[in-house]
């Protein structure tokens, strides 16, 4: 039985995020979101398992997600946050990795003032600890970070890395370059993977569905071509996806990606793109789906 996996979604409690993202003006997502909100969407889309990803640079928030995952059968993996440059980073990583569903870490690179923060030998100790505990690295980056990410990935060739949201290209402006060239360099490294997620919200959320899909399609095609059928994984980025509600919802984004990827990579690739690749990357236990 093939398990279908959403490789990128969030849960949060607004009351615990005072002064943090998402701001109140984003009323579509400025409220609590938990498993009961996502469950009907998963059922309708026949998604079995999700990867729950942090959205605050906070160990308290990460603990909340780990506790929630322990009580939520549909969560197969948690990507959390640890200060990777802390003096005791190795101990913090070990504590995180002790949780049954802990599978990866994500520094919020897009929000840091230094675009080259990741290209730093002070991360070597943290990366060694991640490798010791078989953790993956989620790269929340934008085009301006890609040179530094390339240097980091070359320095740590044994570390499995996945680029979130295709590195958030400037889809609304129609800029393929220099994003495409930078992504091609990254895709040449075998430890680099990519999430097919978050693109509709980069395409101009107020645009209608036809325009958004037309704007997005060249970027989806590029990612499919660069990372192929084994290193690309679909994710919803829910509930952030709600910001692009003018062009559709959870099932619409899934269907659009299925149609496009079947056209460019072939129907045989869909099991990997929509489940198998994320399962292998995050070492997700699928035993409950095999019963």
How should these model regions be labeled?
Residues 1-133, 161, 214, 250, ...:
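Mid-domain alpha/beta scaffold segments of enzyme catalytic cores
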Residues 2-5, 23, 29-49, 221-222, ...:
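Mid-to-C-terminal alpha-helical segments outside catalytic/metal-binding sites
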Residues 10, 55-56, 81-85, 108-110, ...:
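Active-site beta-loop-alpha junctions enriched in small/polar residues
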Residues 13-14, 59-62, 114-115, 170-172, ...:
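Short catalytic/ligand-binding loop motif for oxyanion handling, primarily in non-cytosolic enzymes
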Residues 39, 63-67, 94, 150-151, ...:
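Active-site phosphate/pyrophosphate- and oxyanion-stabilizing loops and adjacent acidic/basic residues
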Residues 117-233:
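Catalytic pocket-lining loop regions of alpha/beta-barrel enzymes
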């Amino acid at each position: 039985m093939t398990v279908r996996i959403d490789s990128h979604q969030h849960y949060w409690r607004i009351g615990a995020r005072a002064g943090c993202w998402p701001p109140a003006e984003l009323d579509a997502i400025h409220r609590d979101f938990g498993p009961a909100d996502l469950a009907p969407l998963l059922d309708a889309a026949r998604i079995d398992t999700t990867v729950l990803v942090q959205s605050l640079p906070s160990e308290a928030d990460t603990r909340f997600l780990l506790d929630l995952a322990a009580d939520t059968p549909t969560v197969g993996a948690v990507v959390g946050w640890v200060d990777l440059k802390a003096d005791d980073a190795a101990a913090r990583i070990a504590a995180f990795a002790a949780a049954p569903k802990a599978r990866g870490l994500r520094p919020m690179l897009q929000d840091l003032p230094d675009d080259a923060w990741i290209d730093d030998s002070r991360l070597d100790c943290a990366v060694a600890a991640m490798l010791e505990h078989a953790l993956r690295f989620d790269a929340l980056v934008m085009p301006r970070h890609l040179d530094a990410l390339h240097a980091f990935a070359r320095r740590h060739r044994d570390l499995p890395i996945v680029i979130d949201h295709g590195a958030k290209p400037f889809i609304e402006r129609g800029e393929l370059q220099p994003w495409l060239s930078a992504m091609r360099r990254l895709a040449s490294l075998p430890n680099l993977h990519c999430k097919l997620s978050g693109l509709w919200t980069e395409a101009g959320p107020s645009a209608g569905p036809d325009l958004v899909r037309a704007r997005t399609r060249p970027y989806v095609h590029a990612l499919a071509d660069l990372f192929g059928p084994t290193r690309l994984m679909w994710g919803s980025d829910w509930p952030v996806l709600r910001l692009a509600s003018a062009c559709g919802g959870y099932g619409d984004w899934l269907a659009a990606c299925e149609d496009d990827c079947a056209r460019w990579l072939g129907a045989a690739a869909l099991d990997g793109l929509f489940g198998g690749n994320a399962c292998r990357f995050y070492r997700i236990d699928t035993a409950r789906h095999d019963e």
